[in-house]
Amino acid sequence: MRVLGVESSCDETGLAIYDSAQGLMAHALHSQVATHAEYGGVVPELASRDHVRRVVPLTRRVLAEAGCRLRDIDAVAYTRGPGLVGALMVGAGMARSLAWGLGVPALGVHHMEAHLLAPMLEPNPPAFPFVALLVSGGHTLLVQVAGVGRYRVLGETLDDAAGEAFDKTAKLLGLPYPGGPELEKLAESGDPGRYRFPRPMTDRPGLDFSFSGLKTRVLQTVQQSREADRADIAAAFQSAVVDTLVIKCRRALRATGSQRLVISGGVGANGLLREQMRAMADQAGASLHYPRLALCTDNGAMVAYTGWCRLSEGQHDDLDFSVTARWPLADLTPPGQPV
């Protein structure tokens, strides 16, 4: 089965073709960073308009790279949610129209499920079951994954997501959008030991997260510091977030008895996080799995693969379609089971 994947949940337009026999044949991504930079964040209307401009050219591009034609596509998968409704509608409308025109099945997939399954596209994918940390600008979740659609949320953020905390802290430090990567760069020249920020909710049992208090502490520190202190503040903040994520993942491995840990989502590209998670996993005797850097952020490849996982079991949508801004991961069911 050859599946075209369409991702348009926020500010990146992603297209990809996944083949069950050949694997990932092609993927292409357009980031809207330049479009939103002057506003300091994503403007939903601008995001939707840019998806409209990009989705067809990117489709042509992946078809050319894969060396196939539209009639070679057996199914189309698209991101149904969660995300920005207008942006989701662009991808969903294109995908459903194309599927209808080709006479092939279509399926709307869950954005977070696609992130969870992204490491399956790597040469050494994790076997089920595993524990996954999904850490991005919009989500921070610890999930026990028994199989496709078989998820148990172990912990989640009670307020800001880790990526959101990175972006907001970067803004406090006067860094340009997108803030997360810029903060990581600044932190490289800083001393993380100069400031001691809290490791939120690590002093009590449980696997939930909270980053709003840490953000407030950083704000207070910035207000009392000089411009020359910014790198040290960035390094101390990054260290606090990474320590928190590592501690919670260690707890999750112990609580579940799992020997496999998956890190996915945009924050999973952070170098310090990868380094510290590797050290912790080695100490715990667990294998550590990431998607390649290009597949940490939103992309069409993970959508195409997730669509294939479900479509190959006979699941598909009817002609009516909807998108959803909010869609709890716990609402998903395994392929073949009623929703």
From Swiss-Prot:
EC class of the enzyme, as a word: transferase
Gene Ontology process terms (BP): tRNA threonylcarbamoyladenosine modification
Domain of life (superkingdom): Bacteria
Principal subcellular localisation of the protein: cytoplasm
Keywords on record: Acyltransferase, Cytoplasm, Iron, Metal-binding, Transferase, tRNA processing
Cofactor: record remark: Binds 1 Fe(2+) ion per subunit.
Binding, substrate: L134, V135, S136, G137, G138, D167, G180, N270
Residues that bind Fe cation: H111, H115, D298
Stored HAMAP family: TsaD
Reported function: Required for the formation of a threonylcarbamoyl group on adenosine at position 37 (t(6)A37) in tRNAs that read codons beginning with adenine. Is involved in the transfer of the threonylcarbamoyl moiety of threonylcarbamoyl-AMP (TC-AMP) to the N6 group of A37, together with TsaE and TsaB. TsaD likely plays a direct catalytic role in this reaction.
NCBIfam families (UniProt xref): gcp_kae1 (TIGR00329), T6A_TsaD_YgjD (TIGR03723)
Name listed for the protein in its UniProt record: tRNA N6-adenosine threonylcarbamoyltransferase
